Swiss-Prot record:
Name under which the protein is recorded: Protein shisa-3 homolog
InterPro entries noted in UniProt: Shisa, Shisa_N
Gene that this sequence comes from: Shisa3
Keyword Iron found: no
Regions that span the bilayer: 99-119
Keywords, sorted A to Z: Developmental protein, Endoplasmic reticulum, Membrane, Signal, Transmembrane, Transmembrane helix
GO biological process: negative regulation of canonical Wnt signaling pathway
Membrane topology: Single-pass type I membrane protein
Stored Pfam families: Shisa_N
Cellular component terms per the entry's GO annotation: endoplasmic reticulum membrane
């Protein structure tokens, strides 16, 4: 920042330094007065003038150096001068050295303030944490998805085994029910009737498919009392 300010000052000195040494003020061109006398031109300020008398003032017939800007003489409108004959390369161009110096300092301060503002806005602002880019790796994707695949496969195998066991148990139960259902009608059909006598026990054959304890099939028959007026034939002899 200090280097930039020094550079601006150096440029100003190189631009206006030699001009200030050669032409510190305006040049009053030579003129011819009313009597016809010619007066040579001079550079403002003259030896007897002050340092701020850098402006050519007066009239076309009488010219002198002064410091008042409102009294400046427009030498381009005068017709009684022979400036081109005296100095062919010099024209009547006003040079406002104080205004140029003040303007250059003002511009330098503006540039300096702008640089300070930019520095404060960019360097003193808290930096936000930069987000790292997400990198996709096939190896990490495989390592993440492989346990999930194995877990889902084991769950499917376990569910298949449980469903197979359930279906086999249901099939066995249905077969047992079917055999039990088919065995019941055979239980209702007894074998040949035993002799209707006392002291004999009835032994019913239990089918293989009927799952009932055998103690309910062997029991003695109680003797019924004879009916009055009726006689039962004895089938034991036959």
């Amino acid at each position: 920042m200090g280097a930039l300010l020094a550079f601006c000052l150096l440029v100003g000195l190189l631009r206006w330094g030699p001009a200030g040494a050669q032409q510190p003020g305006e040049y009053c061109h030579g003129w011819v007065d009313a009597q016809g006398n010619y007066h040579e031109g001079f550079q403002c300020p003259e030896d007897f003038d002050t340092q701020d008398a850098t402006i050519c003032c007066g009239s076309c017939a009488l010219r002198y150096c002064c410091a008042a800007a409102d009294a400046r003489l427009e030498q381009g409108g005068c017709t009684n001068d022979r400036g081109e004959l005296e100095h062919p390369g010099i024209t009547a161009q006003p040079v406002y050295v104080p205004f140029l110096i003040v303007g250059s300092i003002f511009i330098a301060f503006i540039i300096l303030g702008s640089l300070v503002a930019i520095y404060c806005c960019t360097c003193l602002r808290p930096k936000e944490p930069s987000q790292q880019p997400i990198r996709f790796s096939l190896r990490s994707y495989q390592t993440e998805t492989l346990p999930m695949i194995l877990t889902s496969t084991s769950l499917r195998a376990a569910s298949r085994q449980s469903s197979t066991a359930t279906s086999s148990s249901s099939t066995g139960g249905s077969v047992r029910r079917f055999s039990f259902a088919r065995a019941e009608p055979s239980c209702l059909v007894p074998s040949s009737p035993p002799p209707y006598t006392t002291g004999h026990t009835i032994h019913l054959t239990q089918p293989s498919g009927f799952l009932v304890s055998p103690q309910y099939f062997a029991y003695p028959l109680q003797q019924e009392p004879p009916l009055p007026g009726k006689s039962c034939p004895d089938f034991s002899s036959s």
